[in-house]
Amino acid sequence: MNPAPNLILIGPMGAGKTCIGRRLAERFTLDFVDVDQAIVDAAGASIPTIFEHSGEAGFRSHEREALARVLEGRGQLVSTGGGAVLDPGNRALIAQRGFVVYLRVSVNAQLERLARDKGRPLLQRPDREQVLHDLAAHRDPLYRELADITLDTDPYTAADATAHLVVKLATQWQRQDLTP
């Protein structure tokens, strides 16, 4: 059993962090916190607007601050942005303050899930598939390094992925409220 004050979901965009995260939070009576939403709330601007005015570096600065603020709490299910793992300080904080679940997804599934999503600044290019392959090549080793457990979400609906995680978490994450 691995004790940790929070449950933290990591993984690329389109893996299901928000959808599965909300379900898991409800199942285990945890507060659901989406770091991207915390960034928007603190900045008073959408993520595409932050990217437009401050670039990716400015966005990552907002992300660092929001993640640090969020992870001061406990009893939360925290859904991170796909790039949160790029910052070494974020990785250290995530490892220290949570039991980490890596939701893995193939590029093909990402393309299908994100086909109509226009709110992803990194995907506002005609070569979306290549962008996703490049992001995966760079980020996957970081996700793996942090993960306490990993679930491939490709074959599952959000409900099925949640059910699989409930069983895994009940035996691997030391929380009194995780008894199935």
From Swiss-Prot:
InterPro entries: P-loop_NTPase, Shikimate/glucono_kinase, Shikimate_kinase/TSH1, Shikimate_kinase_CS. It is found in: Cytoplasm. It comes from the Bacteria. It comes from Stenotrophomonas maltophilia (strain K279a). It is an enzyme of class 2 (transferase). The keyword Amino-acid biosynthesis applies. GO terms for biological process: amino acid biosynthetic process; aromatic amino acid family biosynthetic process; chorismate biosynthetic process. HAMAP family: Shikimate_kinase (MF_00109). This is Shikimate kinase. Its cofactor is Mg(2+). The keyword ATP-binding applies. Monomer. It catalyses: shikimate + ATP = 3-phosphoshikimate + ADP + H(+). SUPFAM superfamilies: P-loop containing nucleoside triphosphate hydrolases.
